[in-house]
């Protein structure tokens, strides 16, 4: 199942820089492992924002939910999820 996920990060201004950097470091390692596994297929930064658009390829809604809740930045995110389906007019074989 493919999902488009928009993640907007809102770290508290009061969070110490060292704590924020530690959370970001763990987040990066977690997200890169999911990318290597093929579950986090794409990630793009939204210009000028602390936000991204990502494409996940997972087995179920529950798996995506578990992955998102596992993100160290999850408590500081606003997340929007859209389920995706292959379009019948697509000329690509690898987009399902």
From Swiss-Prot:
GO terms for biological process: beta-ketoadipate pathway. The keyword Isomerase applies. Keywords: Aromatic hydrocarbons catabolism, Isomerase. It catalyses: (S)-muconolactone = (4,5-dihydro-5-oxofuran-2-yl)-acetate. GO terms for molecular function: muconolactone delta-isomerase activity. Its EC number is 5.3.3.4. Pathway: Aromatic compound metabolism; beta-ketoadipate pathway; 5-oxo-4,5-dihydro-2-furylacetate from catechol: step 3/3. It comes from the Bacteria. Homodecamer. Belongs to the muconolactone Delta-isomerase family. This is Muconolactone Delta-isomerase. It comes from Acinetobacter baylyi (strain ATCC 33305 / BD413 / ADP1). The lineage of its organism: Bacteria, Pseudomonadati, Pseudomonadota, Gammaproteobacteria, Moraxellales.
């Amino acid at each position: 199942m493919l999902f488009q996920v928009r993640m907007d990060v809102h770290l508290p201004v009061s969070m110490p820089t060292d704590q924020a950097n530690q959370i970001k470091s763990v987040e990066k390692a977690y997200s890169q492992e999911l990318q290597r596994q093929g579950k986090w297929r794409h990630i793009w930064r939204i210009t000028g924002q602390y936000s991204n658009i990502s494409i996940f390829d997972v087995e179920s809604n529950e798996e995506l939910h578990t992955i998102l809740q596992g993100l160290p930045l999850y408590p500081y995110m606003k997340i929007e999820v859209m389920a995706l389906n292959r379009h019948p007019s697509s000329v690509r074989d690898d987009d399902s």
